[in-house]
Each structure stands twice: as C-alpha cells, then as structure tokens.
C-alpha cells in the first residue's frame, strides 16, 4: 500500500512539474445492501490501494431500506470505511437515514439517525480512511453548525463538494416535521453549493465536482412530490455561469450512466460543460474511476473501475 501511495504522490509531483495536473479518484455507492454483499465491498475498498487513486467517495446507501438502521450496523460501516487504504468520504443516502422510519428499518426517527451518522462519520475535519484528507466543513459556519456532512476540498485545481441530498423525494412530503427538516437542509445545501461555485470560479481553478446521493430527476417528476426541482434549477444556473467543466456524481438509481442532461433555459442548447455521472449499485458491486487531466479539454474522463487500467 505504501508503495502505491508513494507512486501516486510521485505522479502528482511529476505532473505539477510539467505544468499539468493529473490524478484519479474513485466513486461508488448503493452498496453493501446486505451482509452477503460485505465481502465484495471490502475487496473493492482494499483494491484501491493499488488503483492509484487519490481518494474515494461513497455516494450513499450503505444498507438496504429493509435492513434495520441500528447503531451496531452504523458502527460496522464506519469501521469498514475507516479501513480504506486511501482517504474515504461518505455522503449519506436515504436508506441511511430518511427511510429509517419504515417498519423493516426499525421505525427510527430519521432526524435521530442523521444525528448518529454525523457523530460516527464526521467527527472532525478530516476524511475517514487510513490516509486522511483535510476537509472544510459547512459546520464551521455558526449558521449551519449542524451540517457536518457537507464537505469541500481542493485538489489539482478542482473544487470538490458534498451535499446531503438523499433519495425518497429528499425527505419532502411525508409530514410537517420532515418538510421543515427538508427546507432547512436544502437552505444549507444551496448556501454550500453557491460557495463552492464561487470558489471554482477563481482564475487559478479549473472545474467543480459535486457529490450527492439522489438522482435529481432531470426529466422532472410530474404528478409526484418533487424534492429536487430547486436543485435542478440551481445546477443549471451555476453550470451556465461557471462555464468550466462541472460534474454531478450521484447514486440512487443503481445503474451506471454518463450523460449531459441540462439545457440552457433561454435557447435550449445543451450545457456542454455539465456532465452527470451515476454510479453502480446493488446487486452490482463496482466503482467508477474519474481521471483528471488538465491537458484534456474536457478535463474529466470517466470509466468503470474494475476494467479501467490506472493511468500511466
């Protein structure tokens, strides 16, 4: 593992010396759902030691909706993620807290489960994993002191930001208490996203990567509660204004896909700088490799982790 990390560090130094920035990171999510998935996920995490990635992000749902949201399971997942050989960042999904009120999940209070996630997975200003990544957390702001899960960091001229946007309609439309939670959390998310875009607009920076759990339903949710409409509009507005490569990486749908779903509101043209990447999900256990290369006009290259060789 040390040799692999040293090789990655040398590669980053070499690219910096040549005037380019080149590195890779890993993303996966929506797994492990059940106990029988755990060995495959452990193997996936362990394999990252030799994959030459700078860090890994799990975009939510570390259990199935029908699995109890117990403290014990949360602690098992924390240990699993903390054993990662590379820095590990976790973004919460709906199965991890908003859906914990369901009978099979244990009839927990979702707000209590989110508090437990914050206690276990975001105890300080570093990532999980045996190698640590220093993070800026939104909770540093007194106004948003609860939102430790929202993190930001900069690497190789790219701003990375995480948002707590789970599936299951983003915790909207179930009852008044959850609707209040939704409104407060989305206010925090929009503030944090605005700050990340402002940071990415700096002359010395090249692009922005946003991580969240939910598929924001770019095609709309006609006739159903829509907890993502304002997020879709915010992404559209920011992508058009930033005019730099921007990725949204999410889970929730359990299907690997890459597309460019946003169009300019004024003329209907595709926003070519914005790309959505959705990761694999249970029952499939795999990860997505994203390569960053400042010499690439599109900046980002995306491929399947188990089949994509490490960059030279």
What residue ranges belong to the model's regions?
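N-terminal active-site segment of His-dependent metallophosphoesterases
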Residues: 18-73, 205
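His/acidic metal-ligating clusters that form di-metal
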Residues: 48-55, 161, 176-262
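Bacterial N-terminal signal peptides
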Residues: 6-15
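Positively charged n-region of N-terminal signal peptides that target proteins for export
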Residues: 1-4
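Active-site glycine-centered loops adjacent to acidic/histidine catalytic or metal-binding residues
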Residues: 30, 60-61, 93-94, 213, ...
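Extended active-site neighborhood of metal-dependent phosphoesterases/phosphodiesterases
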Residues: 68, 73-185, 260-293
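A short C-terminal boundary segment appended to hydrolase-like catalytic domains
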Residues: 288-312
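Stable alpha-helical elements in mature extracytoplasmic
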Residues: 21, 37-44, 59, 70-77, ...
